[in-house]
Regions:
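N-terminal Rossmann-like dinucleotide-binding module
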Residues: 1-48
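Rossmann-fold dehydrogenase core element
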Residues: 107-124, 142-149
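Predominantly a Rossmann-like dinucleotide-binding segment in NAD(P)-dependent oxidoreductases
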Residues: 125-208, 214-217, 351
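Beta-loop-alpha module in the N-terminal Rossmann-like domain of NAD(P)-dependent dehydrogenases
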Residues: 17, 49-111, 309
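Contiguous beta-strand/loop segments that form the cofactor/metal-binding neighborhood of enzyme cores
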Residues: 181-270, 311-323
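C-terminal helix-rich "cap/oligomerization" subdomain common to oxidoreductases
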Residues: 1, 27, 68-71, 302-304, ...
């Protein structure tokens, strides 16, 4: 029998994680939780309709007494749900970001440490083989690095509805940015010291204080710099919406995802993690000033689907529960990436540079 697992949140991410749990003998689903009945009934039906359903997290936690809890809910609930589950003795898989404040993030991590329970944060790109290779090559380009990344989503219908719901508690550069800022931190291995952010409200269908477009710039203490851009909504352009590019003194590496960057795919969940190929450029010159080496195209053979990536995340979770993952390093990475994106939000609101200690 696998670890008794409570799935909290039955949207896109929660459903993918639930499918992973059903397929893995290491886990056994003991309940599905969502505030609205529609999503959990739909997911339960897909999974065979045999799991208990709950509309309230606390009731589900008390009744099922799970070994593990998977939390894929809106950001404002993350800290409360995670600390409650950890305090109850459960291991926790928590979708990013850890919390909507740095203080909340610190509280969640401290609770996991005190409870001696595994806390794994859902940074899906960390388990993607091509993104692992992308990061490895970038580390070999010398210092400083220039890291250029974005993910704009031209969303309509139900996807735009989901984005507007998300905007009630977070911004695009926080919700999506933590993934790519985490990658930047792992590429440089350096400490972030300075953040600038700008943001814009491009729709009357969102709240007056909400913004659905944002751009951040981060400076590291080794001189590396990075920018990240994210926007959601039917107005978003699909021109250059998928930029993943790193430059260093020795050359450059880029994700050359032609199909993922096709028009009409910017809001496609599978396209967000697609790589297809890496283009490696070498800066070395011959004595006559011409390039010594041609660019290399490295085709990606292992291109996991979104559901497969979620399964790999759950394998990491299982390994962490069994003491095979350095969780202190994982928690530091999660906290650092959140600090950067929250600083970008603050910078955009206050119109000033934010310096990180």
């Amino acid at each position: 029998m696998g670890l008794r697992t409570l799935v909290v949140g039955c949207g896109h991410m929660g459903s993918s994680h639930a499918r992973a749990y059903r397929a893995m003998p290491e886990f056994e689903i003991v309940g599905l939780v969502s505030r609205g009945a529609t999503s959990r009934r739909q997911l339960n039906g897909e999974l065979g309709g045999r799991y208990p359903e709950f509309s309230h997290f606390e009731d589900a936690l008390a009744q099922t007494e799970p070994d593990a809890v998977c939390i894929s809910t809106y950001t404002e609930t993350h800290a409360e749900y995670a600390t409650t589950a950890l305090a109850a003795g459960a291991h926790v898989f928590l979708e990013k970001p850890v919390a909507d404040t740095n203080e909340g993030c610190a509280q969640v991590i401290a609770t996991a440490r005190d409870a001696k329970r595994a806390l794994v944060v859902g940074y899906i790109l960390q388990v993607h083989p091509a993104w692992q290779k992308f990061t490895e090559i970038a580390r070999g380009l010398g210092r400083p690095l220039v890291m250029r990344m974005n993910l704009n989503q031209q969303s309509a219908g139900p996807v735009w509805d989901t984005h507007r719901q998300l905007l009630r508690s977070t911004s695009p550069i926080v919700d999506c940015g933590v993934h790519y800022v985490d990658v930047m931190c792992r590429m440089t291995g350096a400490r972030p010291v300075q953040v600038n952010g700008v943001a814009a409200r491009l729709s009357d269908q969102i709240g007056p204080e909400q913004t659905n477009y944002g751009h951040l710039q981060v400076v590291f203490d080794d001189g590396s710099v990075g920018w990240y851009e994210a926007g959601w909504g039917p107005m978003m352009s699909e021109t250059a919406f998928f930029v993943k590019d790193v430059i260093g003194p020795r050359g450059a590496v880029s994700i050359a995802a032609d199909r993922a960057a096709d028009r009409g795919r910017s809001a496609d969940l599978d396209a967000h993690t697609m790589t297809e190929a890496l283009r490696v450029h070498h800066a070395e010159l011959r004595p006559d000033g011409t390039f010594a080496r041609q660019d290399e195209i490295m085709r990606v053979e292992d291109e996991p689907s979104h559901d497969e990536l979620c399964r790999r995340e759950q394998q990491v979770f299982f390994d962490a529960i069994n003491g095979r993952v350095d969780l202190e390093a994982h928690w530091t990475s999660a906290a650092d990436s959140l600090r950067i994106v929250l600083a970008a939000d603050q910078s955009a609101r206050e119109g000033r540079t934010v310096y990180l200690r």
